[in-house]
Amino acid sequence: MQRVGNTFSNESRVASRCPSVGLAERNRVATMPVRLLRDSPAAQEDNDHARDGFQMKLDAHGFAPEELVVQVDGQWLMVTGQQQLDVRDPERVSYRMSQKVHRKMLPSNLSPTAMTCCLTPSGQLWVRGQCVALALPEAQTGPSPRLGSLGSKASNLTR
């Protein structure tokens, strides 16, 4: 009888269809500025502009634009809101930190350089971006070579 052992690596791994792309994306973190949006007809038009792209609205009531950090890390969007609250009473002063984090995976065809982020007066954080058109694969003239190889392997298994 032979004993089989398992070994585990402490090395961090990136789950990706293409490992080299995953490693390259891991090191690209961009922080987007959060601007305060005023209620105006132009703001509504700007909101309608995102119909053909990515749009996410988040409740950020109580946070100021400078308390919000919006980052794009590869295909992930991360929104962090952090506040320091002073609690004062006659006997002492104390501080309390409040932090909220939201993570969302972005569409693969989203252009991170074309993203905008704004905070409405009502406390809604809008993150928007334009999606680029994906190139369609060229039409093939005949059976797919992969399907053919799967068929031959399947027939070998039934023998």
UniProtKB/Swiss-Prot annotation:
Gene3D superfamilies, A to Z: 2.60.40.790
Cell compartment(s), UniProt: Cytoplasm; Nucleus
Entry's Gene Ontology cellular component terms: cytoplasm; cytosol; intracellular membrane-bounded organelle; nucleoplasm; nucleus
Statement: the UniProt record of this protein carries the keyword Oxidoreductase: no
Similarity-based family: Belongs to the small heat shock protein (HSP20) family.
Keyword Phosphoprotein: no
Main subcellular location: cytoplasm
UniProt-listed SUPFAM superfamilies: HSP20-like chaperones
Tissue/organ expression: Testis specific.
InterPro entries on file: A-crystallin/Hsp20_dom, HSP20-like_chaperone, HSPB9
Organism this protein belongs to: Homo sapiens (Human)
Keyword terms of this UniProt record: Cytoplasm, Nucleus, Stress response
Domain sHSP: 36-147
Protein name as catalogued: Heat shock protein beta-9
Alphabetized Pfam families for the sequence: HSP20 (PF00011)
